[in-house]
Each structure stands twice: as C-alpha cells, then as structure tokens.
C-alpha cells in the first residue's frame, strides 16, 4: 500500500493466518522497526520475524511474524511491552544521572 501523506503513526493488518501475521507500519522509522524485530526474534515462540519495504519512498514498511504456537500478534505485543519497559527504565536512569550531575556541579556561593 502506498505511503500515507500524514505524520501520524498507525498500523494495519495486511494478512493474518493461524501462525503468521503481516502488519503494515504506517509512518514508522526503520530504526524502531529493526529494534522491534530483534526483540520479537528473542521470543521462544517465534520461528521467523522480519521487516521489509517494497519501495523506500512510496511504501510503508511491513513486519512479518511467524510463530510455533500461540498468536503471532501476541508475540508482537510482548516485544513492544518489553521494549517499552526497557526505554522507561533507561529514561529513569538518565534522569537520575542528570540530577546527580547537577547536584555535583552546582556553583556554591559564599555569604
């Protein structure tokens, strides 16, 4: 399907079988999709996962996931939850380190 002319992100199920799914990722960056597919591949129930783009300018990327058992969309959801938690923890660590840096580098004035 041709790329939409908006900046909003969304997705669309292109096809769904018992053990596989293809999802079009509308206006998502390849960097994010690569990370998502790498996380999906860590799932023990996943046989295959990949993303591809038919044409880089006019088409949106699609993710393909095939599972041994369970639902393929569940594997995608599990991976998204894991990545969300990872980035949430990373954000908290960054905030903590920035605060620590600030408290160690405050210019102290004398009265």
Curated annotation (Swiss-Prot):
SUPFAM superfamilies: RBP11-like subunits of RNA polymerase. The keyword Lipid biosynthesis does not apply. One of its GO terms (biological process) is DNA-templated transcription. Pfam families: RNA_pol_L_2. It is found in: Cytoplasm. It comes from the Archaea. HAMAP family: RNApol_arch_Rpo11. Part of the RNA polymerase complex. DNA-dependent RNA polymerase (RNAP) catalyzes the transcription of DNA into RNA using the four ribonucleoside triphosphates as substrates. Belongs to the archaeal Rpo11/eukaryotic RPB11/RPC19 RNA polymerase subunit family. This is DNA-directed RNA polymerase subunit Rpo11. It comes from Thermoplasma volcanium (strain ATCC 51530 / DSM 4299 / JCM 9571 / NBRC 15438 / GSS1).
């Amino acid at each position: 399907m041709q790329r939409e002319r908006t900046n909003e992100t969304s997705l669309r199920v292109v096809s769904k079988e018992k053990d596989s799914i293809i999802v079009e990722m509308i206006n998502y960056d390849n960097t994010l999709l690569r990370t998502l597919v790498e996380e999906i591949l860590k799932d023990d129930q996943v046989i295959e996962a990949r993303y591809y783009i038919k044409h880089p300018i006019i088409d949106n990327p699609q993710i393909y996931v095939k599972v041994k058992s369970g639902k393929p969309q569940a594997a995608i959801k599990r991976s998204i939850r894991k990545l969300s938690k990872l980035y949430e923890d990373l954000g908290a660590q960054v905030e903590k380190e920035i605060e620590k840096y600030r408290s160690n580098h405050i210019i102290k004035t004398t009265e």
